[in-house]
């Protein structure tokens, strides 16, 4: 999505295969840019592998918590991200994290379908917050 502050790429890479595919797109389509990665993940996903796949190829990682009870705390995600990238920040929310991007040429938002939905809401591209509840399975 092109904005006045730069390009935002939203991807739902929430598993290792998705992260590999995203890394491929970044290296092929944006070879001359080291993007900022805004990432938030659910604790029950393979977040260590996803970070190891994506973080080495970005200039900065901004870790955020996802709007789900299953979220991995941003601080825990950031601790792991520091093993792969020198510039790692944490934010309480996607909105706060996006303020930290400073209008970078390319910002990649990824790690969770929930986070992708939050990003679309933040950009004014969706119907509303209530749609997020559709993915919260109750037994």
List the predicted regions and their residue ranges:
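Nucleotide phosphate-binding/pyrophosphate-handling subdomain across enzymes
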Residues: 1-60
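C-terminal helical cap/extension that packs against the catalytic core
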Residues: 7-9, 48-106
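Active-site-adjacent beta-strand anchor residues
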Residues: 12, 40, 91, 109-110
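Active-site catalytic pocket residues across diverse enzymes, especially alpha/beta-hydrolases
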Residues: 26, 30, 81, 123-127
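Cofactor-binding loop segments of dinucleotide-utilizing enzymes, especially the Rossmann-like FAD-
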Residues: 39-43, 66, 111
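Short, flexible loop segments at boundaries between secondary-structure elements
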Residues: 66-70, 130-139
């Amino acid at each position: 999505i092109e904005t006045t502050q730069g390009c935002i790429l939203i991807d739902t890479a929430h598993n290792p295969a998705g992260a590999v595919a995203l890394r491929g797109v970044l290296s092929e389509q944006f070879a001359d840019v080291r993007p900022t990665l805004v990432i938030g993940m659910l604790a029950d996903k393979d977040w260590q592998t996803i970070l190891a796949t994506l973080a080495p190829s970005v200039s900065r990682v901004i870790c955020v918590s996802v709007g789900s009870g299953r979220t991995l705390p941003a601080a825990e995600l950031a601790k792991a991200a520091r093993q792969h990238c020198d510039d790692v920040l944490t934010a309480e929310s996607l909105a706060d994290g996006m303020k930290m991007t400073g209008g970078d040429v390319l910002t990649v938002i990824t790690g969770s379908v929930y986070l992708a939905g939050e990003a679309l809401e933040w950009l004014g591209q969706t119907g509303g917050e209530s749609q997020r509840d559709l993915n919260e399975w109750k037994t």
